Amino acid sequence: MKHLLIIISILLLSSPIFGQSFVSVGNSGNIITSSDGISWTKRTSGTREYLKGVTYGNGLFVTDGNSGTILTSPDGNSWTKRTSGTSKYLRGVTYGNGLFVTVGWNGTILTSSDGISWTQRTSGSQQFHLNGLTYGNGLFVTVGESGTILTSPDGITWTERTSGTWVYLRGVTYASSAFVTVGKSGTILTSPDGTTWTSRTSGTSNELRGVTSR
């Protein structure tokens, strides 16, 4: 049983809490849900693709993943595949200011007002993979390969920011009037506005893959 728990924790990623519902996604199209975080139920996703990000907004769950995969669900139980218009690997999705935004490889950025119809946007960073995404204080922030940080007030027009690092940034979040991003070699950067970033001492040289707050 110990080995089984280890496997699940590795394969099933991205578990945000939405009210009384948990939704977790991962390898081979796996989606599981729980009302209390204790008892979990496997759902039928209709795909075998790796699923990476999951978010909730405007009454809809949205998950993204390999080969341009986007799935939506009103309740976390029944899922519908949507047309993304890309075959790129998608690596993060969030909801803010009435808009869903997903990001991925080669600077891919897609937006949708309803989670169903998606539009590709110009990131200006096509040579780099994007891996993390958040929304806070009226700003979308995405991070990725080679220290890439992009910001947008509307999800449509994006501006590249100076991170001061070339490491792969893996995750980003916003809370308490600050953005925080983490990545390889124990990298942690913080910013009050998404524009100016400061390196912080993490105390580890191991890769950091995710960050959150309450």
Q: What function would you assign to each model-found segment?
A:
Residues I6-I7, I17-F18:
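Cleavable N-terminal signal peptides
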Residues G19-R214:
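Residue-level hotspots at or immediately adjacent to binding/recognition sites across diverse folds
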Residues I10-L11:
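Short, linear, compositionally biased motifs with a strong N-terminal bias
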Residues M1-L4:
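Positively charged n-region of N-terminal signal peptides that target proteins for export
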